[in-house]
């Protein structure tokens, strides 16, 4: 890797040392060196090898600036994290006001904020939702979803789509594509995770009819897959199969939720009422890490029975 780092450093333009980050304490060159040495050398180098030498400095609204001053419109938005733009003034103001009195709290006790946010999520979700459990990221929220459907059904198998991605945490990673999990030996037990082709209703039924599947998890629009749109009626057909064979449907709305598709939740376009909705990214406003698992009374019955275990 040393030679690659050298090649990257050699590309930095003359005089770049004089360009400072925000408060003037760090140059772009120093930031590059730190990322290569202490953060993620492969990811950093890969983008530079493609000619994309961005080190993000200032960010505001739907734009950010490279440390060399070049302005970019952010159409990526971190998968919806910045639905409201970078450093949205209303979000910043709410957090600044909140930290005058609040901190992370205590996981044993309720609070005004937890109760109000849970109520807002439940009441704006699809019909039948009852509970909202909070996490710090989308992957963790998927883990909660998988734990919930396993508890509710007393089954263990999780079915997902080929080429899917649901997060880098343990259970979420095991439900994802081999590209993300196999290198880390997180493939999970084969008998508990299975993937089927997208839009293949027959393949889905072939797995579900064994009546040993706890949950089917599907991104309403599979993002890491390349944003293919499900064929009309596919998601509704999957939900019908879930109901037929006693399986719970998890809608991964981390990227498609919170109005990003024009409706509060992307699954609403399909006329499907899932048993679980997973939310994250944009829920944080891009400032405070928070995600949520929204569940029906059936899917979330552990909350009533063994709520202290989480």
Residue ranges and their predicted role:
Residues 3-310:
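Conserved N-terminal phosphate-binding loop of PLP-dependent enzymes in the Aspartate aminotransferase
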